[in-house]
Swiss-Prot record:
SUPFAM superfamilies: RNI-like (SSF52047)
Gene Ontology terms: cellular component: mitochondrial inner membrane; proton-transporting ATP synthase complex
Name of the protein: ATP synthase subunit s, mitochondrial
Gene name of the encoded protein: DMAC2L
Originating organism: Macaca fascicularis
LRR repeats: 62-87, 88-116, 117-141, 142-173
BP GO terms, sorted: ATP biosynthetic process; proton transmembrane transport
Phylogenetic lineage: Eukaryota, Metazoa, Chordata, Craniata, Vertebrata
Length: 200
């Protein structure tokens, strides 16, 4: 709630946008605000709650360990002990998550599945960041990357650092051009990986 208060204060502080400022600029700015990391909030409520708030604020969904239902509404996030709800799966379909928000994932230790589908702000840096996070290197078992136009071979190859990855689906990624090289990289780095390619 406090976050939306801060955002509304910032919005109210805008008296007049320049004439050259179109709606794309405004929404880009707003998405950046939604992705901004509040380290005090992470400290106060824990990494899973803070990451849940970030993901839902940006239009993604989360599912917690021991639950079948996806959390889709920021205002209906469960309350209770901070260590009770651990993120097991993230579905970022059509969300506005971007690299500046990925520090929200630093403390996550139980994420097993990530789906990035039609994420227009996802770039190689996001996948590079995921591959650097020790906790996620251990926990992520499945990942799907679909219709993310800014992802290239460089970002996909960074996924080889997710050492327990068992399943990787890559579909409709126009920036990925060296399919055979990807296959070789993953066969070497993750021999037990099921790699499913639906690329042109």
């Amino acid at each position: 709630m406090m976050l939306f208060g801060k955002v509304s204060q910032q919005l109210c502080g805008i008296k007049k946008l320049p004439w050259s400022c179109d709606s794309r600029y405004f929404w880009g700015w707003l998405n950046a605000v939604f992705n901004k990391v509040d380290y005090d909030r992470i400290r106060d409520v824990g990494p899973d709650r803070a990451a849940s708030e970030w993901l839902l604020r940006c239009g993604a969904m989360v599912r917690y360990h021991g639950q079948e239902r996806w959390q889709t509404d920021y205002n209906h996030l469960p309350t209770g002990p901070l260590d009770k709800y651990k993120i097991q799966a993230i579905d970022a379909t059509n969300s506005c998550i971007m690299s500046i928000g990925f520090d929200h994932m630093v403390g996550l230790q139980h994420v097993e599945k990530i789906r990035l589908c039609k994420c227009h702000f996802i770039e190689d840096d996001c996948l590079l960041r995921l591959g650097q996070l020790e906790n996620l290197q251990k926990s992520i078992l499945e990942m799907e990357i679909i219709s993310c136009g800014n992802i290239t071979d460089k970002g996909i190859i960074a996924s080889r650092h997710l050492r327990n990855l068992k399943y990787l689906l890559l579909s409709d990624l126009p920036g990925v051009r060296e399919k055979e090289n990807l296959i070789q990289v993953f066969e070497t780095a993750l021999p037990s990986l099921e790699l499913k390619l639906q690329l042109k």
